[in-house]
Amino acid sequence: MGNNGAAFKAWLDAYGQAWENRNPEAATALFIENGTYQVTPFLEPMCGRKAIFEYWSEVARTEENIQFGYEILVANAELSIARWSASFVIVLPGLQTQLDGIFLISLDDAGRCKSLQEWWHKQEK
């Protein structure tokens, strides 16, 4: 498949569905076995599906009413970039949250993520 615009769009669509449906299994399946996921540049990347599953299991427990959107900025074989946004309610204390960020993603030939780095800003109400 390689990473082109269509492959990257399919990956982002699946990522959004996994998040909106609060499905850690689906989110984890988007990554290769030893994939990395760096939530912010200040944290060490999570390495491997087990760590990614644990992260997304926590997301599924603590967020609801999730909406995800994106705009592809660059998609090529080495690295793809998207601007993304999400809104959700943090279950306790019921805090409405909006995120706006950038993904840097490297996909393998099967369209699974080898590495994901995020930069984002948060607004809470």
Please place each PLM-identified region on the residue numbering.
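Short hydrophobic/aromatic segments of transmembrane alpha-helices and their interfaces
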Residues: 34-35, 96
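Structured beta->alpha junctions
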Residues: 16, 41, 72-74
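A beta-strand edge to alpha-helix "cap/lid" segment located at domain peripheries
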Residues: 2-7, 53-125
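Secondary-structure boundary/capping signal
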Residues: 23, 35, 64-67
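A short gly/proline-enriched turn/hairpin at secondary-structure junctions
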Residues: 36-47, 58-60, 119
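Short, low-complexity N-terminal intrinsically disordered segments enriched in polar/charged residues
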Residues: 1-33
